[in-house]
Amino acid sequence: MKTTNYLKTVVVTCAISLTMMPAITQAQRNCANESHENFLKTKDSKREANRMSYNTMINDYIASNASKTSAVSFTLPIVVHVVYNTAGQNISNAQIISQIDVLNKDFGRTNTDAVNTPTAFAAVAANTNIQFCLAQRDPMGNPSTGIERRSTTVTSFSTDDKVKFYAQGGLDAWDPTKYLNLWVCNFGGGLLGYGEFPTGTVSNTFGAVIQYNAFGNTGNVAAPFNLGRTATHEFSHCFNLFHIWGDDGGACTGSDLCAD
């Protein structure tokens, strides 16, 4: 398996092909992506410049491959880090597997509600040629289920990435150049999740974090976010998709960087 270049290629491909995703247009969910991005900027003064440079790279890639008609298929190994404070938060393997199934259907456009794609987007909605599987080997090369669990004394997490570090009550990422890391935990404040935007350099916090009862479509899930679409939404941020309103703090001056 390729490492950094492998995931970089996937992120670029997905940023180009994920033109329309049902989870993005569902009833408004409490996504904390903007808050998390602002947190990251306080830690890295060059983050915004790096993101803009990365977006330029994507646009250059699109321009140089405008006539390309075939696509390369990718299957990405996911590791799910379950961080729980109560028994109910320690979701089952079946619930985790149901989430992988939803991701594969959404990214492959085999989801049953694909027929509801708005007419304006029907011509560009497509199979991304990206699929997901639970990792079969851990970073040491040992057999793995792609799931790890930890009981924590932390009752709820926020957008400050503490869930991504063992020393702060969470679980450390597996090598982010070889795995997509996905954390499942309990949020405070009614948050459902967030995903980290790419910058061209893969950090040890890269991945998505999802509220435990908005993960998957079976088991301990709570309506109306019991369809597994929150993870689809947050992973789309990891693949460089913005909210359509531009995440500008309500100023109405932002952009989702997609030509309408």
Identify the residue ranges that each predicted region occupies:
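N-terminal secretory signal peptides that target proteins for export/translocation
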Residues: 1-7
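N-terminal zymogen propeptides
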Residues: 14, 24-73, 107
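Fold-level signature of zinc-dependent metallopeptidase catalytic domains
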Residues: 62-104, 184-187, 251
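Metzincin-family zinc-dependent endopeptidase catalytic domain
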Residues: 97, 101-260
